[in-house]
Amino acid sequence: MERYQELTVLLLLLLLEGGSWGAGHLRPLCRPTNATLAAESDACPVCVTFTTTICAGYCPSMVRVLPAALPPGPQLVCTYRELSFSSIRLPGCPPGVDPIFSFPVALSCSCGSCRLSHSDCGGPRARPHLCTRPHLSLHLL
């Protein structure tokens, strides 16, 4: 019985630490990180790939093992704490088509509920920078 109590205490400590002690090197915690993304418009002939700062990484979460009368708890995602917006101009757009593509730039990140106003909460994409049109690479300063 004493061994069971020791294991329970160890499990609780790991959960309180968000599992970061055991998985710190395998799963980077939520933080700003550089990523290459794509911008394109149906009306413009060129896709532009650019590097910006996004929020990415591991957020601790828990799933109830036993059925409960309570609703499931919220699952946290790595999302923007502070952000700014930047814009690029898509080249070659015909007159009357807005060539400006705006996107969020992560200044700081935190684990929280997903806000669809400025986040894609669908999980990681295999190739988020994939263009369907000919593309140019843009280097932002």
From Swiss-Prot:
Classification via PANTHER family: GLYCOPROTEIN HORMONE BETA CHAIN (PTHR11515), LUTROPIN SUBUNIT BETA (PTHR11515:SF11)
Protein name: Lutropin subunit beta
Functional summary from the UniProt entry: Promotes spermatogenesis and ovulation by stimulating the testes and ovaries to synthesize steroids.
A GO term, aspect molecular function: hormone activity
Keyword Metal-binding: no
SUPFAM superfamilies: Cystine-knot cytokines (SSF57501)
Main location: secreted
One Pfam family in the UniProt entry: Cys_knot
Gene: LHB
Disulfide bonds: C30-C78, C44-C93, C47-C131, C55-C109, C59-C111, C114-C121
Residues with attached carbohydrate: N34
InterPro entries: Cystine-knot_cytokine, Glyco_hormone_CN, Gonadotropin_bsu, Gonadotropin_bsu_CS
Species of provenance: Trichosurus vulpecula
Domain of life per record: Eukaryota
Gene Ontology BP, a term: G protein-coupled receptor signaling pathway
Keywords for this protein: Disulfide bond, Glycoprotein, Hormone, Secreted, Signal
Location within or outside the cell: Secreted
Signal peptide from the UniProt entry: 1-22
Quaternary assembly: Heterodimer of a common alpha chain and a unique beta chain which confers biological specificity to thyrotropin, lutropin, follitropin and gonadotropin.
Family: Belongs to the glycoprotein hormones subunit beta family.
Entries under Gene3D superfamilies matching the protein: Cystine-knot cytokines
GO CC, one annotated term: cytoplasm
